[in-house]
Amino acid sequence: MKRVLIFLFAWTLVVFALQAQTEIDKAMFRAMYKFSYKTSPEQPTFDWVDWMYLDIGNKATMFYNRYAELKDSITNECLKQNIAPEAIHERTKNYPVRGDAPVYCQLYSEKTTRVATRYTKGYYYEEPMVMPQWILDNKSLTLYGYTCLRATTHYLGRTWEVYYTTEIPLSYGPWKLWGLPGLIVRATDADHYFLFELDHFKRLSKPELIIYIHREFGNKGGYTGSEYKKVSKKTFVEYERLFHKDVMAFLDFEMGDIIRSTSGDPAPATEIPYIPLEK
């Protein structure tokens, strides 16, 4: 049974691994954040860590899961070689991605935030870019080699404490946090469910494309699959909740069929506990 489920997950990875790409900007800078988080309020310590990239251009930023990007790249090369789904799973299992891996695009020229994710199908929503209402104070700390100042805000349902540095005069940060006089170096919520920490920052030696993925990979290769479906933010959040509540049931919903084991029984419920960043 375990082998069957591994195959199903691996095949799902193959189906949605490659998507159409559109250039939205060129990244001049890159910040890497360590994203530690709990998956249940009762946990005394963080349960998981994701490594996140923030690519920064002149008119847009993109915040994304580095391991998810690596898995896509490896899958791409494997598909070109007609490698079997189970073998692809073996090659990508060292890059664990917990749950879905949303990509956050801040389109400053359009004053729009675009959030996209994929299960077996792709979805996205857009919302106006609203800058957090920051309260600045004079508390100063040296964090990760930078002199930082403190700021707080109540934003998208949670109270955040952040430290930013004017040594990097870019008004960006992890997730949807932005609008300070310098790069956000550390951010945590009042409940201590989430912690973003700057691991390193660099100016890229040459500009790299910031790519927005919006089309599913075709059955025979190439970016010829269905366009990501635009949904309301409310629907997007509900899909995220349903996916984490029972992965298999959500895949049944998307595929219009019931995933079954070799015995013919429906695949057992598979829950991925999580706490949403917004509430």
Task: Give the residues covered by each predicted segment.
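Bacterial Sec-dependent N-terminal signal peptides
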Residues: 1-26
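Extracellular or lumenal secretory-pathway regions
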Residues: 21-132, 137-140, 147, 161, ...
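Structural motif
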Residues: 143-144, 155
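Gly/Pro-enriched, hydrophobic low-complexity segments
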Residues: 150-213
